[in-house]
Amino acid sequence: MTVSANGRRMLRIEAKNSQTPIEAKPRWIRTTAKMGPEYRDMKNRVTGMSLHTVCQEAGCPNIHECWEDREASFLIGGDTCSRRCDFCQIKSGKPTPLDRDEPRRVAESVREMGLKYATVTGVTRDDLDDEGAWLYAEVVRKIHELNPNTGVENLTPDFSNKPELLQIVFESQPEVFAHNLETVPRIFKRIRPAFKYERSLEVIRAAHDYGLITKSNLILGMGETEEEVVEAMRDLREAGTDILTITQYLRPTSMHHPIERWVRPEEFVAHSEAAYDMGFPAVMSGPLVRSSYRSGRLYAQAMRARGREIPENLSHLNEKLDGSTQQEATNLLDKYGASEETPVAYR
């Protein structure tokens, strides 16, 4: 039996992963902390009121940029997921009991932080009859109720692609419905054993058919090829995905899937160009781009590309079209210059 540092018995896949040391990062995997006035105000509010965001608790490298623009992400449904993905740092196991007061608290946090755009994500809740559909929908409703000028992005699990559960979530009318595909078919089962590639595409297709702006994410560096990435992008576009984010996999701990390759900024630029050529209305691609990165900007961009007017109460999001995108690959190339192929090495 192999035991982790916290005394928990490792899963077989975790024990196998832990045989590979943590990888050393290439020079372009870095951020610069710029603490502007909006960030400092957000920080003071969060600290003073004991609020909780994914941004802080997951140590997101983009927190300074997003908070400066009054954007933040929240994790709902508890801290334990009923499924395990080999890249994800959220622990898996038996989830905690459903907290029906959580939607109100999240909505009040959004108000206290003065957010212009909020992303709501969470754990998978296969233990519940509705797989958490009510919770995901109610958080969106409460945020809209208490914060009519705040856009909401709902990043959800697949709810087993049950139409009646998806309907509950869709009817809450988030500005963006997001469901992340994450990887390519060949390695999907190994990386996300409790999910199904085609089922995830069907969930996105259902949201698109309902009339929602849709979004998904791809993580590179877990064993896929460039050609497979392009095919996955094509599958997402055919399913009706409006917004696409593409990012580099960064290994949370030694128990997670080893990094197979460092994807150069030039490849991220090429994927972004290919995505626009396929007809994606909005794309953000770069090593430290995360699925919620610059989400308000991407929503506004997608709305404009689809010929839709941004509602009057969210018209301030038009300003985000000119905001910063420090982690976009084109900006990294401007900052660091051309990159060299960097083999995976270990600390």
From Swiss-Prot:
Major place of residence: cytoplasm
Domain Radical SAM core: 67-281
Enzyme class, first EC level, given as a word: transferase
Domain of life the protein comes from: Bacteria
Pathway listed: Protein modification; protein lipoylation via endogenous pathway; protein N(6)-(lipoyl)lysine from octanoyl-[acyl-carrier-protein]: step 2/2
Keyword Secreted in annotation: no
Cellular component aspect of the GO annotation: cytoplasm
Record-listed [4Fe-4S] cluster 1 binding positions: 55, 60, 66, 292
Cofactor(s), by name: [4Fe-4S] cluster
Co-factor note (free text): Binds 2 [4Fe-4S] clusters per subunit. One cluster is coordinated with 3 cysteines and an exchangeable S-adenosyl-L-methionine.
Catalytic reactions of this protein: [[Fe-S] cluster scaffold protein carrying a second [4Fe-4S](2+) cluster] + N(6)-octanoyl-L-lysyl-[protein] + 2 oxidized [2Fe-2S]-[ferredoxin] + 2 S-adenosyl-L-methionine + 4 H(+) = [[Fe-S] cluster scaffold protein] + N(6)-[(R)-dihydrolipoyl]-L-lysyl-[protein] + 4 Fe(3+) + 2 hydrogen sulfide + 2 5'-deoxyadenosine + 2 L-methionine + 2 reduced [2Fe-2S]-[ferredoxin]
Positions bound to [4Fe-4S] cluster 2: 81, 85, 88
Location of this chain's protein in the cell: Cytoplasm
Alphabetical keyword list: 4Fe-4S, Cytoplasm, Iron, Iron-sulfur, Metal-binding, S-adenosyl-L-methionine, Transferase
GO molecular function: 4 iron, 4 sulfur cluster binding; lipoate synthase activity; metal ion binding
Enzyme Commission number(s) of this protein: 2.8.1.8
InterPro entries linked: Aldolase_TIM (IPR013785), Elp3/MiaA/NifB-like_rSAM (IPR006638), LIAS_N (IPR031691), Lipoyl_synth (IPR003698), rSAM (IPR007197)
NCBIfam families listed in its UniProt record: lipA, PRK05481.1, PRK12928.1
HAMAP family hit by this protein: Lipoyl_synth
Similarity field: Belongs to the radical SAM superfamily. Lipoyl synthase family.
Name listed for the protein in its UniProt record: Lipoyl synthase
Organism in which the protein naturally occurs: Corynebacterium urealyticum (strain ATCC 43042 / DSM 7109)
Gene: lipA
